[in-house]
Amino acid sequence: MSVRGRVAPSQTPSRIPGTVLAYLALTKPRVIELLLVTAIPAMLLAQRGTVNPLLIVNTLIGGMLAAGGANALNCVADADIDKVMKRTARRPLARAAVPTRNALVFGLVLTAGSFLWLWWTTNLLSGLLALATIAFYVFIYTLLLKRRTSQNVVWGGAAGCMPVMIGWSAVTGTIQWPALVMFAIIFFWTPPHTWALAMRYKDDYKAAGVPMLPAVATERQVTKQILVYTWLTVLATLALALATGWLYAAVAVVAGVWFLAMAHQLYAGVRAGEPVKPLRLFLQSNNYLAVVFCALAIDSAIGLPHLF
């Protein structure tokens, strides 16, 4: 047997995991975590108690397919700027690990699969909400807003709010006011979360020509808007207490004070001309959202009496 013949068999298995990981990376698994953190508590609140585990699993599968499809299509649309930005230069399309056409087909298959799965296992409304979310994220945010306005993540962030709507509709078949309040919580939370990260990578956005707020505004202007949206986030979490028990309300107050303290600290540091660490707010904002929605899940699962 030739040397060539001996090497070839060992190369094939090593390529397969790399290809699988590249396609997995297209779905941005870290982003999908938001689905898990918010959809399950929304379902528990809608039921005010235990939800059929199979319904939860089916909703999460459909939601993950939808998020994966949207993210894959986003990678296709953003391949040119991903190559320029250091933070995204290792994404599959930026380093040519996946052909663009394959990534497009992959995203479309996941999109169709999410709609069909949710329609089949939950209800038509949930499937349509997933489809609308993907369309909004790809066409409105990625293609229309992202490269044109510094408020891109404000309006584009609406797509990230949809897991709570899908989770609620999967249980009830409708959309009611608590689902809209949960939508508002994530909607207001998204700008401070994203802008804190963008402050760290503003040079990347400038190089790519993306007018993310920190790339086109002063740090004082950015942190002022972060502060405004942080207050709106906390107020929205308190409004949700009208539909929950005392446990969620208590956690929302304590976590809200903590989140506000971090935002005020960042703003005060910028005003004073001191070195600031916006990445800390970015990381802790994840913890804040997780704590609030975990408290909501526990409060709802226990079925504590409403405060009001």
From Swiss-Prot:
Keyword Transmembrane helix carried by entry: yes
Family: Belongs to the UbiA prenyltransferase family. Protoheme IX farnesyltransferase subfamily.
Species lineage: Bacteria, Bacillati, Actinomycetota, Actinomycetes, Mycobacteriales
Catalytic activity from the UniProt record: heme b + (2E,6E)-farnesyl diphosphate + H2O = Fe(II)-heme o + diphosphate
Transmembrane segments: 31-51, 53-73, 102-122, 124-144, 149-169, 170-190, 240-260, 288-308
Organism for this UniProt entry: Mycobacterium avium (strain 104)
Record-given protein name: Protoheme IX farnesyltransferase
Pathway note: Porphyrin-containing compound metabolism; heme O biosynthesis; heme O from protoheme: step 1/1
Entry's localization field: Cell membrane
Membrane topology label: Multi-pass membrane protein
Coiled coil: none
